[in-house]
Amino acid sequence: MIQKNWQELIKPNKVESFTHDNSNIISVIAEPLERGFGLTLGNALRRVLLSSLRGAAITAVQIDGVLHEFSSIPGVREDVTDIILNIKEIALRMEEEGPKRLVVYKEGPGVVRAGDINTVGDMEILNPDHVICTLDEDAEIRMEFIVNTGKGYVPSDRNCVDDGRIGLIPIDSLYSPIRKVSYKVENTREGQVLDYDKLTLTIETNGAVNGEDAVAFAARILQDQLSLFINFEEPQKEPVEEADSELSFNPALLKKVDELELSVRSANCLKNDNIVYIGDLIQKTESEMLRTPNFGRKSLNEIKEVLACMGLHLGMEIPAWPPENIDDLAKRYEDQY
């Protein structure tokens, strides 16, 4: 059964997350994971988060009266090189595809901030207080920006726009909405097993995307890329056969677990957990079984082998279980199993 290669690996029932004091920083926790999977998943997700998520960024700027980036502007305290460095740090959210044109015009004295830019459509400036430049009295400045969408880092020489305009300065673009990603792998306990992995991913964004959503997008990218390597059709799960028109489940589920040839430890653990029938047992997941006191991986493997011989496995869903007259049914179908 090839599906055992992935079905028998333990995996988290859910992923938890919490936001830090800075709302743009979030930690995502996944546990328990098989030993080694914390490092494998953490490193892969980190790389995809930093390199492959799409975002918006300014790709070029035109400043009235400026021909190149090594100029200075009368009445503006910063030179053009410093202004461009400040422009690179403007964080944007844009749902539509680019390019788009934005304009800012301001007279001095005063500070020109990102929030002074006139946006269009659904575009949003995420750090409106960010300073672009400072104007002295009687100074003025008009700038036109080109905004585009993409992923990763694109240097200025790839942002050249050949539209014949003089003074259009291409700039480096950091499209990624992710600022920082780190991960930590620790040991965690599940039942009697002490060395499972606990993965904690900490993501800092520029506010264009929620950190939890960013992890989901990265996981979807990995899923899509890895699907190329799957060269087989996954076997379909076989439903539990109905052995009798009166029952909606296999009568073998009415067999009591104490009739199985289990070790004393395994049998006692099932008894203490009020698991009486096989139907009770197969609806338990591996994670639930490992949380049973004194129940370890050895007992889990023993039970899985016994169930496999009967064509059953843990984690099955039996909608009609338990029947109201389970004791009577167990006696009636005793000879059939």
UniProtKB/Swiss-Prot annotation:
One Gene Ontology term from the biological process aspect of the record: DNA-templated transcription
Function description: DNA-dependent RNA polymerase catalyzes the transcription of DNA into RNA using the four ribonucleoside triphosphates as substrates.
Gene Ontology terms for molecular function: DNA binding; DNA-directed RNA polymerase activity; protein dimerization activity
Protein's UniProt name: DNA-directed RNA polymerase subunit alpha
Domain commentary: The N-terminal domain is essential for RNAP assembly and basal transcription, whereas the C-terminal domain is involved in interaction with transcriptional regulators and with upstream promoter elements.
Top EC group: transferase
Entries under InterPro entries matching the protein: DNA-dir_RNA_pol_insert (IPR011262), DNA-dir_RNA_pol_RpoA/D/Rpb3 (IPR011263), DNA-dir_RpoA (IPR011773), RBP11-like (IPR036603), RNAP_asu_C (IPR011260), RNApol_insert_sf (IPR036643)
